[in-house]
């Protein structure tokens, strides 16, 4: 999985979501804007993170494994049981 570039800095984060409150848009393919990176940070539980392009890659995220979202790359998530997480955006 990619790492955040050293030059990007966090500028906002989402509220904490659970399996019951995750926005439906995150469950379907979507992407960040040009120049916007993000980290999916798990507080509790497991989240399935799928990168849809250029090749499909699925990663199980937990407290030790954070998901890195590259700019303009299609991706989606799926809760695996009970989960709490948030997303931190950087540019």
Please tell me what each predicted stretch does.
Residues 1-19:
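Transition segment at domain starts
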Residues 28-34, 50-51, 58-60, 77-79:
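Short histidine-centered beta-strand/loop micro-motifs
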Residues 15-35, 67-71:
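Conserved short histidine dyad/triad with adjacent acidic residue
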Residues 34-49:
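Short, conserved beta-strand element in jelly-roll/cupin
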Residues 71-91:
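Ligand-binding loop in jelly-roll beta-barrel domains
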Residues 54-72:
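Short acidic-glycine-tyrosine-enriched beta hairpin
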Residues 7-11, 66, 86:
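Long, compositionally biased, intrinsically disordered regions
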